[in-house]
Amino acid sequence: KTGLEAIERTVIDRAVKAIYRPYLANPCPENMPILSDLHQALLDQHLPEADRVAQALDLYVSGSLNVFNHKTNVDIHNRLVAFDIKELGKQLKKLGMLIIQDQIWGRVTQNRSQGRATWYFADEFHLLLKEEQTAAYSAEIWKRFRKWGGVPTGATQNVKDLLSSPEIENILENSDFITLLNQASGDR
């Protein structure tokens, strides 16, 4: 868990700027870059550090975890958008949850600028709190949602799992109300 070196961050930054340039000039869905565009932009730099980062992306670009290397087929402009992560494997679930949470935050900020509230409903909410990164992000957006016209709502049948998260205190403190229905004997 050492993270990226400064030179790796630099080659990624350079590649991201290059692949987003056409999209920013003409922001339509067809111009939205995907992971293979980033992969190619890294290889085009002809630097060992860029090649190393590109090799690390191979699994997600052309390997068995390439599910995110495609244009989206989700119409995010509908009033109701549902994301289902059930089919994501264990390795992609955390990444998928972070992408979805980021998409939802984008919708909240967009709706706020239009004076519209956004209702965010997360079923099986305890799953978001299992992983440290998604739990921290959940707590952060939960706090910000209310200020930005969002109505965050979490539902779970596993209250015990929910309460075991260190982030749950922040979430509960930033909730107007909490409703507990009949619990299984193990969750009482």
Located regions from the model:
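A short beta-strand-to-loop transition that corresponds to the Sensor-1 phosphate-sensing loop
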Residues: G154-V159, N182-S185
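Short flexible/disordered coil segments
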Residues: L95, F177-G186
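A short helix-turn-beta junction within AAA+ P-loop NTPase domains corresponding to the substrate/partner-engaging
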Residues: P166-L181
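Short glycine-/polar-rich loops that comprise or flank the Walker A/P-loop
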Residues: N78, W148-G150, E173-F177, D187
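P-loop NTPase motor domains
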Residues: K1-G150, G154, L163-P166
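A short acidic, often aromatic-flanked loop/helix-cap motif at beta-alpha or helix-coil junctions
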Residues: K90, G186-R188
